[in-house]
Each structure stands twice: as C-alpha cells, then as structure tokens.
Design a protein with these regions (language model features):
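S-adenosyl-L-methionine-dependent methyltransferase catalytic module, highlighting the catalytic core
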Residues: 1-136
Length: 138
C-alpha cells in the first residue's frame, strides 16, 4: 500500500492525440479514457482534467506541427514506428533540438512571450496537451 486512506495520486502525462510524432523517451502515451479506465481499476474517485494552451500557445503548436511534418515526411519507411525506442532516442534528440532552435530563430517574439499563465487546466478534452488526473483512494 502506497497511499493512506483518502490519499491522492496526481499524474500528468502527454495526451497522445496532441503528440506530433513518436517520442522514444515516452514508454507509453495515453488517450484520456484509456488512462481514466486504468486509474478507476485501483482508485475510488478519478478527476480527469487537461492542460490547455491559449491562442498564443496554439499558434506555436501549429508552427511546430508544420515543422515536424516537414521532418517526418522524410521517414518514407515509417521507421519512427518500426524501430525500437532505444534506436530512435539519439536521432530524436538531435532533430528535436534542431527543430526547436529553428522555431525559436524564426519566431523569437512568439516563443519568448509564452509564459506559464498562457496555460490553463480544465475538463479533459481531445485538444488538451497533457492529461492531468487526481485519483483518490478511499
């Protein structure tokens, strides 16, 4: 037993629906209902929320999405989904850093202006960046 009665387990994890490509550093990514179902097997109460971005964050996300699409279109053999995680980690790191640097250089004002206050927590939905769940053990 890890939690006392009425103890809370708080977890955040990426929302697979908003992931732009396979991240080899993530062992598993979840859909909202999938994670909720897993938690409900062990916890009496599960509060499902999501982390959302405002218009500025979504503008950055869409620019990043286009940039990632330019990179992944070169993966004609779909190796990102066929190779084991460990083989993708260093290429992912290199390409991710190059992509983030390019995005910053091309969008300095936007990138520099994004703050924590541009994010909010609300009821879970398909367009949340991260799943944020609070599970309570009775």
């Amino acid at each position: 037993r890890v939690l006392r009665p009425n103890g809370k387990f708080i977890v955040t994890t990426p929302n697979v629906l908003m992931s732009l490509t396979r991240n080899p550093w993530h062992v598993r990514e979840y859909h909202a209902d999938e994670l909720k179902n897993i938690l409900e097997c062990e916890f009496d109460e599960v509060e499902a929320m999501g982390v959302f971005g405002n218009k500025k964050v979504m503008t950055y996300y869409n620019k990043n999405k286009k940039s990632v699409a330019r990179i992944t279109r070169l993966d004609i053999l779909d190796l990102q989904h066929r190779l084991p995680r460990w083989m993708l980690q260093w290429p992912y790191d290199i390409l991710n850093r190059l992509n983030r640097r390019w995005l910053y250089d091309e969008n300095k004002t936007l990138t520099s202006s994004i703050k924590m206050s541009d994010y909010s927590i609300g009821p879970v939905a398909d367009n949340c960046f991260d799943l944020f769940y609070i599970a309570t053990k009775k």
